[in-house]
């Protein structure tokens, strides 16, 4: 009898959990919006949630199946979102009528110190004030000074590669996991430019900054699980006061920044890094920012820059090894730039003048976009209409909007032969043909990425140094189908980003 009661209880519990997991799935049926059938718990994100596919691939394939609809219902796990497939509608929501959609959706439910103080998470006037405070931090003039710090990290990376080539005398080049190498580079650049800390993760791969930083990245196993849990059961996550990040590790980064600020103020020390720029911005702002709010802007580099900058270098070098004509043309521009420097170190201005470099990076950002999508949250009821005034949809306060960046980037209506790597799409002659709001590598509207200059100068600087000294070729372990082999948030193959580097001299 007891066994029967236990079985019945389990059946009831299982049924209740199932009903909870599907409770939102009638949303679009009731609001008369086309949608694809979702699955319990995972919605329309089954493959990505189970890490059998990358988020980019899952979202792009969803877009390809539904792109004939200007708007379509989409379930991010249990959360209903309205996807805007039409560029003109994206313009309306993200630019023209921004006041109705000024915020991002709650990315995750977090009880973590610092997380809710990040610019990308802030809302309304608080976000606006911080954005205005930070905008002068990312001007070309400020990035120009910071580039000198990046040059030091580029040099250390090249020294490491040079040492690797010398350990294999007589061989034509050597194999390297570009992802591992670029993670260390990204880490060291963030350490010096955002936290005022000098580390060399090639000579000392066990340094505290690198190991703690690696453990905080969302794509890592435990962090990924916690992220998915906070997305699936946000109220429970908040109620139990669970945290995604180890508080001791968060405190480590906070302590680095606060102690650096205190030391510099006491000894009147300046350095062209993010801490210095934030200190100056804080002093010039009418708002009274707390230390945690300042620290959070440095902390965001681990989420906005660490993986993204590393992956952009990896996907670009991946394309260069499979497109040797592009690689050779870029190398020729690099050699010309090197000659023009006349023995001087690489500068921010020199990098900015490299037109083909910019075309290559732009095409890489199109084909292998850093963020598969961006989002908005409706803050005021809003009726979305077509150009002729036809009503398309009534948005309610709290509705979440999905902008399918990767889908737009790979849509053959906007980019012919979208799977082809063709930097000439971004030539002066052709880029004017691009349909507005179909190319969104750094987001769209007032809430676009504030740090795009920072990201681009790091990637361009590293590619300049790498291609100047090495030719990139395929190795036996080079992945052939990156699209099909990647999983998680970014295009990182499970087996690694292996490539063969051949010294040019």
UniProtKB/Swiss-Prot annotation:
Cofactor: heme
GO cellular component, one term: endoplasmic reticulum membrane
Role description: May be involved in the metabolism of insect hormones and in the breakdown of synthetic insecticides.
Protein name: Cytochrome P450 9b2
Keywords: Endoplasmic reticulum, Heme, Iron, Membrane, Metal-binding, Microsome, Monooxygenase, Oxidoreductase
Chain residues that bind heme: 449
UniProt KW Cell membrane keyword: no
Protein origin, superkingdom: Eukaryota
EC number: 1.14.-.-
Subcellular location: Endoplasmic reticulum membrane; Microsome membrane
Family: Belongs to the cytochrome P450 family.
Annotated SUPFAM superfamilies: Cytochrome P450
Topology of the protein relative to the lipid bilayer: Peripheral membrane protein
GO molecular function: heme binding; iron ion binding; monooxygenase activity; oxidoreductase activity, acting on paired donors, with incorporation or reduction of molecular oxygen
PROSITE patterns to which the protein is assigned, alphabetical: CYTOCHROME_P450 (PS00086)
């Amino acid at each position: 009898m007891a066994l029967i009661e236990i079985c019945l209880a389990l059946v009831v519990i299982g049924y209740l959990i199932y009903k909870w997991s599907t409770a939102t799935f009638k949303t679009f049926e009731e609001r008369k919006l086309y949608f694809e059938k979702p699955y319990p718990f995972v919605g329309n994100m089954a493959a990505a949630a189970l890490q059998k596919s990358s988020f980019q691939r899952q979202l792009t394939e969803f877009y390809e199946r539904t792109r004939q609809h200007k708007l379509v219902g989409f379930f991010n796990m249990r959360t209903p979102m309205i996807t805007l497939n039409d560029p003109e509608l994206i313009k309306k929501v993200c630019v023209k009528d921004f006041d109705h959609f000024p915020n991002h959706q709650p990315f995750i439910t977090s009880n973590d110190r610092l997380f809710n103080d990040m610019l990308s998470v802030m809302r309304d006037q608080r976000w606006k004030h911080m954005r205005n405070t930070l905008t002068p931090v990312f001007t070309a003039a400020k990035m120009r000074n910071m580039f000198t710090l990046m040059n030091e990290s580029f040099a250390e990376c090249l020294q490491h590669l040079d040492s690797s080539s010398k350990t294999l005398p007589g061989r034509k080049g050597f194999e390297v996991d570009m992802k591992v190498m670029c993670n260390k580079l990204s880490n060291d650049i963030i350490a010096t430019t955002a936290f005022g800390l000098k580390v060399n993760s090639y000579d000392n791969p066990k340094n505290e900054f690198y190991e703690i930083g690696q453990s905080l990245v969302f794509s890592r196993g435990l962090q990924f699980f916690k992220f998915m849990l906070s997305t699936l059961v946000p109220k429970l996550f908040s109620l139990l006061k669970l945290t995604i990040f180890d508080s001791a590790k968060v405190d480590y980064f906070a302590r680095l920044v606060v102690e650096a600020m205190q030391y510099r103020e006491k000894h009147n020390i300046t350095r062209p890094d993010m801490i210095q720029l934030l200190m100056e911005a804080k002093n010039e702002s009418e708002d009274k920012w707390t230390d945690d709010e300042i620290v959070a802007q440095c902390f965001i580099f681990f989420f906005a820059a660490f993986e993204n900058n590393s992956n952009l270098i990896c996907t670009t070098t991946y394309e260069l090894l499979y497109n040797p004509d592009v690689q050779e043309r870029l190398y020729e521009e690099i050699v010309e730039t090197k000659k023009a420097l006349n023995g001087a170190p690489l500068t921010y201005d020199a990098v900015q003048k490299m037109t083909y470099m910019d075309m290559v990076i732009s095409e890489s950002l199109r084909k292998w976009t850093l963020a598969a999508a961006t989002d908005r949250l409706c803050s005021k009821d809003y009726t979305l209409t077509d150009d002729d005034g036809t009503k398309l949809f009534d948005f309610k306060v709290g509705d979440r909007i999905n902008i399918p960046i990767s889908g737009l980037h790979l849509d053959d209506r906007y980019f012919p032969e979208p799977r082809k790597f063709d930097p000439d799409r971004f030539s002066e002659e052709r880029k004017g043909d691009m349909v507005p709001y179909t190319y969104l590598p750094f987001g769209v509207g007032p809430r676009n990425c504030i740090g795009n200059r920072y990201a681009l100068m790091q990637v361009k600087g590293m590619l300049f140094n790498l291609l100047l000294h090495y030719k990139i070729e395929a190795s036996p372990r080079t992945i052939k189908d990156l699209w099909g082999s990647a999983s998680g948030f970014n295009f990182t193959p499970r087996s690694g980003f292996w490539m063969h580097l051949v010294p040019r001299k």
